């Protein structure tokens, strides 16, 4: 594991073997960083550049980042979100979103226990999602849910 100077790591965080966490990354409490995960910190990397700036990245509480993923600088991975193995994260990940792929896209939503959520009902602002495993329920913003449906080709 390589953790650069200035990285902020919360309580109960698990960072697996061969992860690389560069300056500018903040990982909040109870997050998980899988093996071979890499965080970047420079939008315009050049070996000869003298004016580069660290671009901050935030991994929120309870989020999980799967093995071999790359998290580009400047993004926020939301609370209890889950990034699938081998993903390339180029944009913010909403809270409780399940994302994977290259680039990573929202493919669903997950419970705090890690299982996929099912849509229960919706109103103008939120979609209520429920976990069939532990019976927890979560309001997901209509904006996040709409992006998910569009990524599936739905209207």
Report the location of each language-model feature.
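Structural signal for interior beta-strand "rungs" in well-ordered beta-sheet cores
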Residues: 1-100, 104-106
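Cys/His-enriched microdomains
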Residues: 106-109, 129
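Short cysteine-rich clusters marking metal-coordination/redox-active sites
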Residues: 111, 131-134
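Cys/His-rich metal-chelating microdomains
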Residues: 114-116, 137
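Short, non-ligating residues that shape and space the ligands of small metal-coordination modules
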Residues: 119-120, 139-143
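Short linker/helix segments within small regulatory modules
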Residues: 120-128
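Alpha-helical "lid/cap" subdomains adjacent to substrate-binding clefts that gate access
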Residues: 130-131, 138-140
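Short, intrinsically disordered terminal segments enriched in charged and Pro/Gly residues
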Residues: 145-155
């Amino acid at each position: 594991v390589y953790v650069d100077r200035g990285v902020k790591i919360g309580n109960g965080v698990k960072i697996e073997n061969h992860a690389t966490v560069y300056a500018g990354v903040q990982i909040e409490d109870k997050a998980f960083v899988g093996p071979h995960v890499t965080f970047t910190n420079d939008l315009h990397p050049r070996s000869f550049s003298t004016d580069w700036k660290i671009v901050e990245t935030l991994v929120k509480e309870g989020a999980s980042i799967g093995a071999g993923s790359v998290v580009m600088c400047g993004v926020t991975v939301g609370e209890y979100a889950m990034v699938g193995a081998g993903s390339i994260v180029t944009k913010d990940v909403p809270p409780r979103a399940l994302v994977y792929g290259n680039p990573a896209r929202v493919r669903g939503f997950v419970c705090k226990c890690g299982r996929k959520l099912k849509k229960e009902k919706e109103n103008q602002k939120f979609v209520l999602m429920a976990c069939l495993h532990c019976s927890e329920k979560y309001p997901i913003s209509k904006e996040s849910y709409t992006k998910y449906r569009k990524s599936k080709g739905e209207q």
